[in-house]
From Swiss-Prot:
Pathway: Amino-acid biosynthesis; L-arginine biosynthesis; N(2)-acetyl-L-ornithine from L-glutamate: step 3/4
Catalytic activity, reaction form: N-acetyl-L-glutamate 5-semialdehyde + phosphate + NADP(+) = N-acetyl-L-glutamyl 5-phosphate + NADPH + H(+)
Annotated catalytic residues: C149
HAMAP family: ArgC_type1 (MF_00150)
Organism, scientific name: Methanococcus maripaludis (strain DSM 14266 / JCM 13030 / NBRC 101832 / S2 / LL)
Domain of life of the organism encoding this protein: Archaea
Entry GO CC: cytoplasm
UniProt KW keywords: Amino-acid biosynthesis, Arginine biosynthesis, Cytoplasm, NADP, Oxidoreductase
Pfam family name, one: Semialdhyde_dhC_1
Name by which UniProt lists this protein: N-acetyl-gamma-glutamyl-phosphate reductase
Amino acid sequence: MKTVSIIGGTGYTGSELLRLLSNHDEVEVVNVTSRKEAGKNLTDYHPQVRNLSNYNDLKFQNIAPEDIDSDIVFCATPHGASMAIVPTLHEKGINVIDLSGDYRFEDIDMYESWYGLKHSGKIDSAVYGLPELHREKIKKSKTIANPGCYPTGAILSMAPLVANDLVEDRIIFDSKSGVSGAGVEASQTTHFANVNENIGPYKITKHRHSPEIGKELQYLANKNLKVSFTPHLLPVTRGILTTAHSFLKEDISPIDVIEIYEEFYKDEFFIRIFEEGMPSLTGVRGTNFCDIGGFEIDQYGRIVVVSAIDNLVKGASGQAIQNMNIIMGFDEKEGLGVGGLKP
């Protein structure tokens, strides 16, 4: 049994890690850190995991990175905080999956420009942890930068077309997310009275996930692409629905496109291709699946692809566990093989 520590255990991603890891047969959580809640019973703060695994016996700890001695560490801290923690764990040879944006960019200037932070802990060997694109690199790395939630749904929705050079260099993503994507801290934006019965775009051209989507698709295309991304906030708790648009370079049918997607993702358990019907948020809620469908082409050659993920699972904690499974040589589905909560 391998041991796991969670640094930053009071947020939504920490909560989801606990829920999902309670079903994992190969690991045991031994440390959950929180400076604010240190000394308090874990299950008093997270009653939803009471009586699961060994959680009734755990208390939050305020433990320094250099004092952590477990096989795997999930770093579920805010952007900017991880870079002060991960290098220490890296030097100790501990397997680290970082859920912040601190290690998603090889280009530090790009990170600093979009996040408005000075990066202080560069690790050249860190790998972008999107298994469907980088599985072999993930296997060989001990430091994984878990992808952002919006980029996960966006990249996976268009990767087969981009990799096969079937679309023009302009791609537009329109994504709609539940409010849990904004984190556990309350704000005016996520206040019930402002979100309920409402929908609205935000950071319409300047969301920090834009360059993350762009760099990964450019990696696949091996050329520059013009990627546009606009997020919207939905009055729901979980899920991201992404609608991707581009123009085909050649005259192919929706059936051809579906075959291309099925071939590209043929070995990917967590990718479900919809030949008919449409992906939905309820279909993926609570799961590590990314559902992809739509595949419609209009009279101008515009192709539209739709993807759905749970932003807290495939968009965060579930994908982090998938990455851990790959690093440790576990069954990739371990702890993650559940269906959607529908209705």
